[in-house]
């Protein structure tokens, strides 16, 4: 099939006939063109020789690939439609017999007609009509194929007709030439098929079949004209119409008939034969008066019995809309389930109005706006294609706008147009945003500098939808924000069209704007000499003319001036550079020569200037450079006093932060004046603008061009030509005798660029060969893998692995993979090495090098700029080569830390600038408060002030301090060292109190004995470590200080530390962390090294000396990179090493020779320092605690550090032992290959431990002061075992293999059963515990002390022993009872324990030779006394140690054992033991013979409450003088003056009538320092509360507390504080009916009563806080409550009443003096009335007439003699 042309045409003819049987008429030429396209896209198809459904689907796959590759424009419009028709034909199992019968009958009818006329008119293309069937026959059941009226029409339904057998014999039908008619009719139906679908129909679920074109299509104007010309053939037209109706009836079976009247009334314009479409949305039924159905969607079409088509809206099921709405809400608009519903709905004919109604119903406002924008854009594109196809379907028809805005017009659309509408709508739906949570602020949605405008509009519309709900309501606002919130580039693009287009137009205008557009604008601005802003505003204006002559009107290629300069042009010959063409060498652009070898860049200067190297990249390069050379004499100064010469840029330059440092030409050339050199510095104004100028040095003998190294800091910077950006400072040249490497520099540069163009990643796999323990492995570099993985097939079988508990996850998952049991040494081709533990996984296709290995290799990932890459390629450079002219650049990327062995970046700065590492700081300090701390600077003497000024200047020059305006300040001072030099210190105690202290990172001192024997070592000391570690900038202001001046001659100069200050509490910890972080990379790279770091001392040790040196070199670089400096003079490379106060000489470690100065040992502080140093050395000396005990005893006594101390003879002998031991003793380094033994010696007082390996390794000592008062020796040995095991793991990382101690196995067995410490000490110990010491003289010397084991005190009661009971009382009486005899005696102690201990001593002294069973009711003695037999040292505390020593001597002197048991006192149990204890207890009781006197009680009460003399006199009935003497003898009360008597402030007449209230401060209560005080003026009862402030809420809280104690007052008087004058407090008083008045402002006398109460309260607080009662350790509330208790209940007045008595128990009867008084208002006399209060100059009279009190001057009152009145 298809191999010959005739066969090709024959196949097409047969295919036409086959299609015709299905009612489909196509054009033969179109089918030929279709199979030509099949042949082009499927070359294999003609060779198949046959066709079936499988091969035809393969053709469809080829169409799909072609469509995806070239798009819809390159594929024929009818390709997929024909493919679908043929697919249905091939897939059909059998022909439809009804269709076959109809065809046969039609042929007969057409033959009767005028066949000749038809044939003549067969070439009239405009008369042919076509009917295409699009129903998917394959998907239908046979019953469905027969009846179509019950199915809703598909997306492209065929015309429906009634199935009526009676019409088969229509006499009006005649025969016609069907072949010619079908060919001609097919032409009018190609436009009916939808030519532009979003996806080809065979692969679109919503359009799975080809579109079927209606029998009546949208006619053209030419068709109308030709129909009018063929009026004579009307009979043929009628027959043709009947034919079509008949065929459609057979196919659809629709027999619906409508009267002709209806047809005529609902016809549309233009009208085509055989079709009449209604304008209405529903069919009018004349026979009924039913209401028309609801107008919804979609459009359906039916045919009546007369062959007339009717369209109307069918009622759509609203459950589908609800389902779609639910899917959008729950899953999102673009979820697969939602799209499936939309595609199902799109199978119907939905008009544009229907789509808009549906979308508005189910989508939010923002999403609806997005859909509408996308739908209009799709329709606009489709309309353009329709215009090219000439089918007349314009934008208004597709969108339902303009003349097609109503549903009537949209119902008349052709099926092909409906198909395009459905495609545009579904495509717009698919572009809806994914369900998310956009922001709520619409004005806050702004476009980023590199964000695409479409993404920005999408975010804006989404946010608008959430805010407005209906996006159309805010479309104008969204459009305005889309312009205002766009970035400058997009605003410039939109500005000319801002009012001429909508959001869709905005998106099109900004579609090409992105990062590359921004960079292009910057380049264009530089080319044109404009700023970016000016360029954007003027980009549509004329940009100029010729680049050669500068004139407008022509281009450079047509410039006559340029051509006239060289009238006689020479013809170039063969290029001497590439030898491949005829052109000039300076114009050669070849990258390779004729042999294919790469060519180097151009050498020398050409018209374009020097070859582009590091100093001339295209970004920031010369764009319009001037070629004039200027000397330094041409430079200008800004002013006569300017130190620098101005340097300008000769180019219009654009710099971006991504470009890094760039060189700028200045046009100034050397040399400099004689004996000078130049320093290039930046101007301050350029730094403010964001341009950083790197400083550079210009040599005196440099004759080349001076260039400026500049970098844009954070944004794009445009440097106009001629702008001053730097200055050249000339300095005198100092010539030294250093070695000269080059005789003369000239215009040459030293070295090459440090830049290396990294080769980009290609399709080739990035593999790498590494050696693991000498075996080569090839693997892929995987930056996404955390760990390195080796496939099991490559893993050697003899290399051990272990199963891990981790899971590896990637594309797959590996549970519990195996990992190498040991670290493997990796090595690459450059001999770089490290350690790695890879994982081993089976069935892995390739080995993977993960980040655990790549980080050790220092592999870096670079993202090159595409523009830079293109520029480099254009200049002839290749990746992998240096960019210098000699291509000898360093072949590695520039690291972030800079290169310390090379200076500069580029050429001209090769000897000028160091690219320093990024500044590192110490960790930030956490502060408790941000409130500034200011401590005034104290005065300094003239000598110390001069020293301080000199030291400050030195620190200022060193950069350790800077000038400061900080609000913090702490004083400084200077001290003179032994060498005579001064040292600057700062008192930072106040600052330290405000910071959170960091814990110690190294709680112990590292020991050099843990270094393995035989290791090579290097010792390093860091220079001024604190001063090389910078503080965090935010912390520097807190360490400010002031430098004073004598006689305040000038303001103090203020400075602050930039580095760690000495004296700051966290400086040691920050120093350790900073240095440790610098060393950490070296530790990881050299894991096999033994590296010790303590503060600023570092020790490196290793097996191989070469590795130690390499590690030292890397460590040196790491320290230098972080700013730390190594002191060269303190680097130790050979024995003997001095480290941390020890001398290391081979395996031996000795202490440095020390001479102890005795003349300085005078105070407790001196001896404390000395013994601290000696105790530090004890691990390396075999000095026992007993040897040092005389020295330790000196520390006892007075705790004052300056208290005098002196050396006793025993202490002097101990000091000599220390000196001898320091000089003679040594220890050795540990050998990890030998077992480690821990020896315990039973030395005097406490045992001593020693780690042993044929020589002493480390001595271990217990603390000089035991934790317990009585520590048995065997418990001390157990404590030493615990300490030794801990030290072994702490220093050596292992447990001792053997512990040798002095007890035998039986004794250890006893200790395990009867003590608590021994089982703990030996718990989980897997080694050996022995008592056989190695044969060594040192060990034998240490074994001289005998072992003490209990033998006198029995653990159980003895038989036939004397029964004794002991007891003691706090009365000082001790007693013991034996054999019905009681002995009691008086002691001088009041402690019951000490008294009973003396009773026990008396028992042991009375019966030294008798066996005893002693019972005591003291559990403490019953536990302590049995320990005395084995205690070697008793801790001295008070008098207890003295009695324990006496008791211990009695035990040692006994030869007969005794038993000491405990019995509970007052148990009430029967029996002789309880009875004997009770008798003894009664003997300690004493009957008081004298009562405590009142004076003693008064003294006790005053000591407890500090009562005044009057209260003591009245309460305890003592004399006035005795009470006064008690108060005078009190050291607390004597400092407080007596409180004056109550004054004359108005008082309440009854309780709670008048209160005074105020607030006082007591700072010692901290946050509760605000003490609110209220006092009842009648009784003086005081109520106070602690509050955290003085606001109204605190006042109200205080009053509520007062109400709960003494009730509610009638009247409250306060001052004018804000808490009392507020409206809230006024409302509070008003609601409770409390009268509130204020005193006289700023006059405290108006509040005199409460002010005196403040004084009384504070004095009481001060008194009781110094006492010995519990409130001194209590909370502030306890102390306040105690004071109120004293003032209200204990202090008595002259009537022997307290304030509480006066308040709660007022007198029921009282006599008042009677007076007459004059009213000053009317000068009338009244009375006699009683006097309530008679004050100083004033009298309070109670007017019985007015029932109110009146205050009157004393002069207006006359007393009635001897007249009184009682008041009940």
Swiss-Prot record:
GO MF terms, alphabetically ordered: aspartic-type endopeptidase activity; DNA binding; DNA-directed DNA polymerase activity; dUTP diphosphatase activity; RNA stem-loop binding; RNA-directed DNA polymerase activity; RNA-DNA hybrid ribonuclease activity; structural constituent of virion
Propeptide residues, chain positions: 101-159
A Pfam match: zf-CCHC_5
EC number(s) given by UniProt: 3.6.1.23, 3.4.23.-, 2.7.7.49, 2.7.7.7
Ranges for domain Reverse transcriptase: 956-1144
Residues with lipid group (N-myristoyl glycine): 2
InterPro entries assigned: Aspartic_peptidase_AS, B_retro_matrix, B_retro_matrix_sf, DNA/RNA_pol_sf, dUTPase-like, dUTPase-like_sf, dUTPase_trimeric, G_patch_dom
Intervals of motif PPXY motif: 200-203
Highest rank taxon of the organism: Viruses
Residue ranges annotated for the Peptidase A2 domain, each copy included: 777-853
Chain ranges of the G-patch domain: 864-910
Zinc finger (Integrase-type) boundaries: 1493-1534
Cellular component annotations (GO), alphabetically ordered: viral nucleocapsid
Residues reported to bind Mg(2+) 2: 1367, 1396, 1417, 1481
PROSITE patterns cross-referenced by the UniProt entry: ASP_PROT_RETROV (PS50175), ASP_PROTEASE (PS00141), G_PATCH (PS50174), INTEGRASE (PS50994), INTEGRASE_DBD (PS51027), RNASE_H_1 (PS50879), RT_POL (PS50878), ZF_CCHC (PS50158)
Sites annotated Cleavage: 100-101, 159-160, 214-215, 297-298, 523-524, 756-757, 874-875, 908-909, 1493-1494
Positions of the RNase H type-1 domain: 1358-1489
Entry binding sites for Mg(2+) 1: 1021, 1096-1097
Active-site residues annotated for this sequence: 782
Annotated keywords: Aspartyl protease, Coiled coil, DNA integration, DNA recombination, DNA-binding, DNA-directed DNA polymerase, Endonuclease, Hydrolase, Lipoprotein, Magnesium, Metal-binding, Multifunctional enzyme, Myristate, Nuclease, Nucleotidyltransferase, Protease, Repeat, RNA-binding, RNA-directed DNA polymerase, Transferase, Viral genome integration, Viral matrix protein, Viral nucleoprotein, Virion, Virus entry into host cell, Zinc, Zinc-finger
Residue ranges the record marks as coiled coil: 215-251
Boundaries of every Integrase catalytic domain copy: 1547-1708
Entry similarity comment: Belongs to the retroviral Pol polyprotein family.
Function: Nucleocapsid protein p14: Nucleocapsid protein.
Protein name (Swiss-Prot/TrEMBL): Gag-Pro-Pol polyprotein
Protein's gene: pol
């Amino acid at each position: 099939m298809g191999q010959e042309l005739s066969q090709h045409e024959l196949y097409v003819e047969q295919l036409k006939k086959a299609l015709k049987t299905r009612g489909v008429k196509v054009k033969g030429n179109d089918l030929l063109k279709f199979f030509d396209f099949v042949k082009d896209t499927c070359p294999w198809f003609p060779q198949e020789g046959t066709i079936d459904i499988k091969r035809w689907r393969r053709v469809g796959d080829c169409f799909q690939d072609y469509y995806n590759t070239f798009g819809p424009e390159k594929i024929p419009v009818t390709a997929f439609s024909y493919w679908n028709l043929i697919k249905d034909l091939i897939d059909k199992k059998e022909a439809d017999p009804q269709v076959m019968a109809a065809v046969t009958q039609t042929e007969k009818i057409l033959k009767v007609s005028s066949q000749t006329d038809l044939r003549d008119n067969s070439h009239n293309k405009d008369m042919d009509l076509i009917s295409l069937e699009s129903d998917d026959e394959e998907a239908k059941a046979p019953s469905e194929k027969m009846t179509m009226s019950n199915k809703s029409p598909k997306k492209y339904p065929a015309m429906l007709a009634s199935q009526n057998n009676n019409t088969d014999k229509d006499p009006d039908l005649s025969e016609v030439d069907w072949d010619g008619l079908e060919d001609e009719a097919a032409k009018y139906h190609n436009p009916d098929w939808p030519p532009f679908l979003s996806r080809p129909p065979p692969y679109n679920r919503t359009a799975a079949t080809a579109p079927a074109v209606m029998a009546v299509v949208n006619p053209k104007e030419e068709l109308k004209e030709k129909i009018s010309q063929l009026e004579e053939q009307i009979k043929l037209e009628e027959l043709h119409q009947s034919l079509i109706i008949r065929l459609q009836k057979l196919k659809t079976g629709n027999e619906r008939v409508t009267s002709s009247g209806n047809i005529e009334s609902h016809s549309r314009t233009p009208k085509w034969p055989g079709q009449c479409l209604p304008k209405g949305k529903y069919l009018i039924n004349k026979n009924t008066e039913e209401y028309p159905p609801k107008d919804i969607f979609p459009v359906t079409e039916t045919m009546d019995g007369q062959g007339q088509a009717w369209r109307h809206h069918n009622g759509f099921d609203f459950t589908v809309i609800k389902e779609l709405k639910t899917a959008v809400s729950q899953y999102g608009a673009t979820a697969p389930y939602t799209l499936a519903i939309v595609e199902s709905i799109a199978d119907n004919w939905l008009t544009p109005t229907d789509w808009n109604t549906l979308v508005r119903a189910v989508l939010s406002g923002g999403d609806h706006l997005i859909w509408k924008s996308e739908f209009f854009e799709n329709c606009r594109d489709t309309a353009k294609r329709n215009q090219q196809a000439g089918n007349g379907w314009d934008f208004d028809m597709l969108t339902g706008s303009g003349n097609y805005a109503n549903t009537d017009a949209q119902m008349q659309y052709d099926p092909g147009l409906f198909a395009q509408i459905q495609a545009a709508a579904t495509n717009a739906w698919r572009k809806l945003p994914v369900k998310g949570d956009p922001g709520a602020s619409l004005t806050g949605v702004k476009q980023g500098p590199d964000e695409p405008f479409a993404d920005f509009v999408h975010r804006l519309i989404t946010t608008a939808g959430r805010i407005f709900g209906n996006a159309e309501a805010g479309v104008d606002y969204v459009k305005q924000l889309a312009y205002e919130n766009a970035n400058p580039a997009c605003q410039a693009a939109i500005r000319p069209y801002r009012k001429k287009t909508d959001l869709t137009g905005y998106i099109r205008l900004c579609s090409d704007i992105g990062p590359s557009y921004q960079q292009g604008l910057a380049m264009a601005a530089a080319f044109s000499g404009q700023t970016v802003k000016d360029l954007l505003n003027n980009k549509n204006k004329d940009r100029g003319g010729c680049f050669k002559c500068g004139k407008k009107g022509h281009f450079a290629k047509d410039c006559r001036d340029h051509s006239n300069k060289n009238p006689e042009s020479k013809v170039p010959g063969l290029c001497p550079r590439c030898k491949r063409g005829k052109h000039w060498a300076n114009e050669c652009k070849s990258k390779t020569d004729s042999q294919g070898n790469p060519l180097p860049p151009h050498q020398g200067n050409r018209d374009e200037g020097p070859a582009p190297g590091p100093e001339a990249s295209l970004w920031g390069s010369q764009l319009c450079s001037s070629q004039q050379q200027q000397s330094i004499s041409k430079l200008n100064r800004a002013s006569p006093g300017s130190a620098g010469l101005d340097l300008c840029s000769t180019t219009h330059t654009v710099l971006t932060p991504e470009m890094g440092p760039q060189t700028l030409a200045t046009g100034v050339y050397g040399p400099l004046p004689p004996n000078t050199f130049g320093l290039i510095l930046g101007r301050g104004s350029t730094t403010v603008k964001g341009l950083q100028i790197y400083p550079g040095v210009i040599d005196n003998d440099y004759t080349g061009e001076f260039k400026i190294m500049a970098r844009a800091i954070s944004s794009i910077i445009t440097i106009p030509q001629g702008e001053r950006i730097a200055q050249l400072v000339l300095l005198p040249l100092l010539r030294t005798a250093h070695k000269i490497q080059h005789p003369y520099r000239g215009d040459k540069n030293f070295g090459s660029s440090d830049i290396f163009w990294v080769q980009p990643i290609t399709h080739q796999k990035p593999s790498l060969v590494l050696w693991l323990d000498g075996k080569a492995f090839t693997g892929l570099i995987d930056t996404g893998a955390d760990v390195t993985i080796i496939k099991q097939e490559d893993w050697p079988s003899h290399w051990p692995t272990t199963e891990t508990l981790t899971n590896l996850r990637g594309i797959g998952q590996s549970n519990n993979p195996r990992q190498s049991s040991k670290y493997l040494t990796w090595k690459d081709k450059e001999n770089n090495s490290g350690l790695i533990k890879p994982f081993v996984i089976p069935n892995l296709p390739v080995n993977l090098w993960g980040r655990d290995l790549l980080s050790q290799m220092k592999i870096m990932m670079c993202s090159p700029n595409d523009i830079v890459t293109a520029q480099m390629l254009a200049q002839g450079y290749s990746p992998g080569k240096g960019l210098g002219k000699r291509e000898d650049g360093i072949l590695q990327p520039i690291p972030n830390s800079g290169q310390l062995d090379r200076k500069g970046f580029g050429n001209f700065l090769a000897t000028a600038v160091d690219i320093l590492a990024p500044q590192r700081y110490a960790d930030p300090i956490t502060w408790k408060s941000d409130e500034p701390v200011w401590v005034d600077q104290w005065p300094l003497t003239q000598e110390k002030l001069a020293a301080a000024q000199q030291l400050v200047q030195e620190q200022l020059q060193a950069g350790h301090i800077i000038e400061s305006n900080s609000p913090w300040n702490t004083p400084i001072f200077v001290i003179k060292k032994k060498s005579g030099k001064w040292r600057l210190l700062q008192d930072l105690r106040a600052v330290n109190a405000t910071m959170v202290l960091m814990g110690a990172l190294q709680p112990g001192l590292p020991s050099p004995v843990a270094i393995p024997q035989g290791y090579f070592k290097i010792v390093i000391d860091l220079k001024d470590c604190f001063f090389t570690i910078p503080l965090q900038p935010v912390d520097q202001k807190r360490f400010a200080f002031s430098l004073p001046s004598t006689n305040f001659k000038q303001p103090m100069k203020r400075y602050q530390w930039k580095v760690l200050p000495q004296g700051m509490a966290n400086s040691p910890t920050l120093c350790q962390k900073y240095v440790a972080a610098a060393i950490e990379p070296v530790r990881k790279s050299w894991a096999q090294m033994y590296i010790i770091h303590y503060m600023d001392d570092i020790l490196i040790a290793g097996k191989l000396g070469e590795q130690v040196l390499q590690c030292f070199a890397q460590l040196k670089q790491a320290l230098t990179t972080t700013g730390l400096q190594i002191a060269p003079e303190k680097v130790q490379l050979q024995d003997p090493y001095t480290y941390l106060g020890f001398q290391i000489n081979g395996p031996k470690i000795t202490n440095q020779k020390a001479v102890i100065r005795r003349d300085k040992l005078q105070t407790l502080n001196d001896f404390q320092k000395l013994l601290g140093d000696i105790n530090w050395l004890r691990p390396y000396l075999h000095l026992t605690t007993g040897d040092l005990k005389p020295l330790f005893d000196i520390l006892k006594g007075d705790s004052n550090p300056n208290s005098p101390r002196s050396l006793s003879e025993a202490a002097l002998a101990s000091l000599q032992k220390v000196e001898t031991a320091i000089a003679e003793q040594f220890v050795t380094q540990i050998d990890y290959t030998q077992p480690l033994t821990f020896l315990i010696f039973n030395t005097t007082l406490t045992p001593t431990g020693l780690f042993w390996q044929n020589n002493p390794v480390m001595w271990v000592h217990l603390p000089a002061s035991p934790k317990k008062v009585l520590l048995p020796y065997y418990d001390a040995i157990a404590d030493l075992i615990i300490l030794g095991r801990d030290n072994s793991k702490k220093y050596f990382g292992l447990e001792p293999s053997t512990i040798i101690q002095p007890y035998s196995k039986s004794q250890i067995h006893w200790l395990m059963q009867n003590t608590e410490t021994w089982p703990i000490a030996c718990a989980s110990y897997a080694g050996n515990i022995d008592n056989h010491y190695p044969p060594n003289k040192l060990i034998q010397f240490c074994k001289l002390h005998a072992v003490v084991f209990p033998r006198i005190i029995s653990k159980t009661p003895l038989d036939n022993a004397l029964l004794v009971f002991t007891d003691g009382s706090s009365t000082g009486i001790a007693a013991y009872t034996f054999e019905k005899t009681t002995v009691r005696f008086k002691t001088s102690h009041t402690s019951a324990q000490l008294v009973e201990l003396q009773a026990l001593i008396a028992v042991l002294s009375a019966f030294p030779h008798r066996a005893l069973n002693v019972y005591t009711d003291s559990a403490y003695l019953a536990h302590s006394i049995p320990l005395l037999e084995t205690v070697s040292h008793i801790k001295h505390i008070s008098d207890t140690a003295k009695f324990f020593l006496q008791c211990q001597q009695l035990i040692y002197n006994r030869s007969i054992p005794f038993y000491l048991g405990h019995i509970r006192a007052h148990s009430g149990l029967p029996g002789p033991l309880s009875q004997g204890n009770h008798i003894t207890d009664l003997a300690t009781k004493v009957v008081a013979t004298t009562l405590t006197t009142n004076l003693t009680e008064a003294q006790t009460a005053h000591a407890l409450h500090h009562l005044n003399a009057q209260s003591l006199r009245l309460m305890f009935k003592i004399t006035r003088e005795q009470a006064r003497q008690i108060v005078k003898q009190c050291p607390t009360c004597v400092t407080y003056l007596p409180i004056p008597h109550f004054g004359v402030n108005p008082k309440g007449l009854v309780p709670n009538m008048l209160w005074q209230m105020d607030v006082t401060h007591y700072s010692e209560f901290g946050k509760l320092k605000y003490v609110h005080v209220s006092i009842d003026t009648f009784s003086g009862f005081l109520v106070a509360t602690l509050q955290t402030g003085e606001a109204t809420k605190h006042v109200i809280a205080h009053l509520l507390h007062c109400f709960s104690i003494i009730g509610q007052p009638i009247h409250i008087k306060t001052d004018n504080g804000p808490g009392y004058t507020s409206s809230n407090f006024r409302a509070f008083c008003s609601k409770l009916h409390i009268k509130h008045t204020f005193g006289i402002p700023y006059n405290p006398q108006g509040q005199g009563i409460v002010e005196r109460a403040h004084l009384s309260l504070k004095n009481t607080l001060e008194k009781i806080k110094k006492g010995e009662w519990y409130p001194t350790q209590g909370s502030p509330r306890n102390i306040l409550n105690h004071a109120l208790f004293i003032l209200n209940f204990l202090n008595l007045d002259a009537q022997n009443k307290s304030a509480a008595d006066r308040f709660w128990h007022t007198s029921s009867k009282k006599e008042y003096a009677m007076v007459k008084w004059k009213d000053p208002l009317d000068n009338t006399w009244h009375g006699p009335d009683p006097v309530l209060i008679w004050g100083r100059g004033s009298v309070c009279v109670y007017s019985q007439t007015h029932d109110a009190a009146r205050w009157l001057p004393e002069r207006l009152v006359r007393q009635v003699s001897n007249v009184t009145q009682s008041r009940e």
